């Protein structure tokens, strides 16, 4: 039998010249790209958070590289990052053999990178992509998704419940105090203010207890009820006020993550429409690179567009010339802002697709299909009756935006043979409300969306931000935040967005090198072919 030969294997061998750890990192490995890019970024804002003195600190650039590369490789846990610094050669090389523990990594991520400091890093990388011609920043494809908070789904506080319970408790306390005042024959017992406030109840409670202690009271049960008001009810009112202060304009929040709002998520395993604490994440993309991001508490998208566009301007100093978004952003207020600031809105509105259908276009009873005399301000119904301008109304949205609508009414529809097809109201004449300003914005948006460039943007939109969200959520497993508060979750989403951009950039560089190598090979083949001939 032939002897089997094995390669030399000795774990206890010493090397005369130990290899450099960089020798184990391939030249075209993504970790080298991350290292090269982050080496050229300005991190002075992060360095400003260090006070100096005391023991030596881990270098912020090293910690930044480790965390960014960890997110690029789908590692989101600080403990796992610390473990890889001892086990993985790429992390060892990137950290220069430094081994910060998970507390140092987590503290750097949640504190040093917060308050806009990481946004500065992200902005510099976007500028790099722009300088290389990968993005122009002239167009933004905008979309949003909801990401769950780390908070438990059963930690909710609802504004409606708080207000209702507070009102009930105020009335209950007022009743107890009135009974006590009557028992003590107080002169001002019937002269209480119409609006009951916690401060008034506090003063009345202290006064009643003081008088009871001074004069004595036969009804011990009443004395106990007033004491309970001071010990339990008034602190409970303070708790309700604290809830309302945290809620602000929101309808809900989570006790374990007060910045998170309860929202309906796309992933609903029980299929019962249950709300969960989360954040509405907004991104804008170009060529599938994320160029801007932000987090909002509003579950709907239309209220986030204006602050999101303003955040882009604050970072880059200008507005993009073209904005592309779906119908969730197509409100009158948003159109007005975009047109006023020189942006071209390729933004759908909620009736856009319905208006394109034959059934809609062939329906003469719809306001959009009726003849409108702009000079004399009246509509003409299918039977030829004039619908005159009879009133004006003003509505205020939850964002404080004021819309003006005009009411148009027919003179008499009681004997109209088309009434059953026209409307089903009980009144003898049809009325309709028209927002002319909103209609003009929608008409302009429709013309843009149906143009050649609009069709191009509409076909690109589903493969721009939606593809980024799908890649991040399903290919890289980021579906839930690990940190609490808007301040920290914004850093976390920024890291996810930067990792997404770097993955694309690494792939682009690899593809460019491959094409360059193929071109050089073709050039080298041509002289050889000529000499052979």
Locate the predicted segments by residue.
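Short secondary-structure transition/capping motifs
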Residues: 23, 55-59, 70, 74, ...
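Generic alpha-helical segment signature
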Residues: 14, 27, 39, 59, ...
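Catalytic micro-motifs at enzyme active sites that drive phosphoryl/nucleotidyl and oxygen chemistry
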Residues: 53, 92-96, 127
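Anion-binding and metal-coordination hotspots
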Residues: 8, 67, 74-87, 98-533
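A ubiquitous short alpha-helical element
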Residues: 3-6, 50-54, 453-456
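Basic, short loop/linker segments at the boundary and entry of helix-turn-helix/winged-helix-like folds
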Residues: 25-68
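Short helix-loop boundary/capping segments at the starts of domains
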Residues: 36-47, 72-75, 87-94
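Hydrophobic alpha-helical membrane-insertion signals
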Residues: 1-32
